[in-house]
Amino acid sequence: IIMDIKVDNIYAFKDFHINMSYPKKIVNSTIENEFLEERTNFRYKKVNIIMGTNATGKTTMGKLLMLFTNYLNDGGYKRFTNRIADVKKAAKLQIDFVTNENLLYRFEMNVGPKAQKSYTEEDVDIKIFYTPIETRDSYETCASRLDMYECEETTYEKVNTNGWKFSYPIDSSGDKVYSTIEENSKYI
């Protein structure tokens, strides 16, 4: 369950933030049980509709979530550095999420401006923190603990994503018979 996303300088996202929690109980909601099982104060939006006109970032949001979930499967950082919009500036990605355990995780990635021809592992600082979700906790309570670093740190291998997988049509074929914008010199 994705709870919160903050992005800066990745793809075209600049100082972007979306939160998918409910601080207060919604009365007469048409969607039932928008909370964690046995954690009724930990509320989240089960349905999120991303709308917008052409070229407003809807597909790019999906691609960003794909990068994140695939990172949790293999720990490859280059998938992020290849999507930094302005290499002269720092880039940041922060995602709060819950798996099938009663833990709130925070993925934090900070990438400094590119100092060499390509990014190295030292340029990319990725940390994953977590805090237990206690019976009476809300998302806001747990996020506050993460903000104050009253939490534990872990690695991507130890996050139980229970097989999260995300693919995109461009990834489905090894024999590509089409070209992408990135490969066409008439596009910047």
Model-flagged regions — what are they?
Residues 1-8, 186-188:
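Extended helical coiled-coil dimerization/tether regions that scaffold
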Residues 2, 13, 121-125:
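A broad structural signal for short, well-ordered beta-strand segments within beta-sheet-rich domains
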Residues 7, 95-101, 128-132:
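Short acidic, glycine-rich loop/turn motifs
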Residues 112-188:
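Electropositive, glycine-dotted interaction segments
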Residues 20-25, 110-116:
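A short, sequence-level motif marking secondary-structure junctions
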Residues 4-66:
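Pre-Walker A-like glycine/lysine-rich segment at the N-terminus of P-loop NTPase domains
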Residues 2, 15, 90-92:
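Exposed beta-strand and adjacent loop surfaces of beta-rich binding modules
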Residues 43, 53, 63-115:
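Conserved P-loop NTP-binding catalytic core
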